Swiss-Prot record:
Species the sequence originates in: Rice dwarf virus (isolate Akita)
Biased composition (Basic residues): 141-157
Protein name stated in the entry: RNA-binding protein
Stated family: Belongs to the phytoreovirus RNA-binding protein family.
Subcellular location field: Host cytoplasm
Length: 181
């Protein structure tokens, strides 16, 4: 069966409250109808995710794919269809090089790759701190004992300073009362 024989017709997707809410959140105009071509043979079913034209099996979204057999997120499908007209391939997004990505972030953010870069930078910095801790285990044990002594000394200083401020605040309150009388 060829692709032309497999083509049945345009399938209109139903719009529910979730789809309308998604379009409102994205500040997009809700199209009158979402039309998607339906193919009998799965071999010719192309994915309608926001990346460029490819087969369902080759989708970079992996488990978030929207195949023609199960439209779980009509809003994503509608990104390719504006008022029933297909956006040209040059207007669609290029496939992602990552295995998986957050589709919600993909829809709302300007540059979806930023969050993954930030996470990678954070993991590198935490790895550096772990490496520093591993280099001097004997120093850390000695410093803990010193830290206990210094913390108790700090507490004593804080307690004495707090009691002095309490006394001064009490005396200030007494002077205010006497001035009122």
């Amino acid at each position: 069966m060829t692709a032309s024989e497999s083509f049945v017709g345009m399938q209109v997707l139903a719009q529910d409250k979730e789809v309308k809410a998604t379009f409102i959140a994205l500040d997009r105009k809700l199209p009158a109808n979402l039309k998607v071509p339906y193919m009998k043979n799965a071999k010719y079913r192309t994915c309608i995710c926001p990346s460029s034209n490819h087969l369902v099996d080759d989708c970079v979204c992996e488990d978030v794919i929207i195949a023609y057999t199960a439209h779980r997120n009509n809003a994503v499908a509608a990104l390719l269809y504006s008022d029933g007209n297909v956006i040209h391939r040059s207007g669609t997004l290029k496939p992602k090089s990552q295995n998986r990505f957050d589709l919600r972030g993909f829809l709302t953010s300007v540059n979806p790759g930023e969050s993954s870069r930030n996470e990678a930078g954070a993991s590198k910095s935490t790895q550096k701190t772990y490496d520093r801790k591993d280099k001097s285990p004997s120093k850390s044990r000695n410093s803990k004992k010193g830290a206990k002594k210094s913390s108790s000394a700090r507490k004593k200083k804080e307690y004495s300073s707090n009691s002095e401020t309490d006394l001064s605040s009490d005396s200030d309150a007494n002077t205010r009362k006497s001035k009122r009388k």
